[in-house]
Structure formats: structure tokens, C-alpha cells
């Protein structure tokens, strides 16, 4: 979830 910069801080990586 992004902090409000408009872009997520890190790429979406599903936890397996």
C-alpha cells in the first residue's frame, strides 16, 4: 500500500 506518493513504495510481490 502506497503512503500517498501516488506510487507504491515497493513492487507488488505475493507472499507464498
Swiss-Prot record:
Subcellular location: Secreted
Record-listed Pyrrolidone carboxylic acid modification sites: 1
Superkingdom in the source lineage: Eukaryota
Molecular function as annotated in GO: neuropeptide hormone activity
GO CC aspect terms: extracellular region
Main location as per UniProt: secreted
Keywords: Amidation, Neuropeptide, Pyrrolidone carboxylic acid, Secreted
Modified residues (Leucine amide): 16
One GO term (biological process): neuropeptide signaling pathway
Function: Mediates visceral muscle contractile activity (myotropic activity).
Family per record: Belongs to the pyrokinin family.
Name this polypeptide is given: Locustapyrokinin-1
Protein species of origin: Locusta migratoria
Lineage: Eukaryota, Metazoa, Ecdysozoa, Arthropoda, Hexapoda
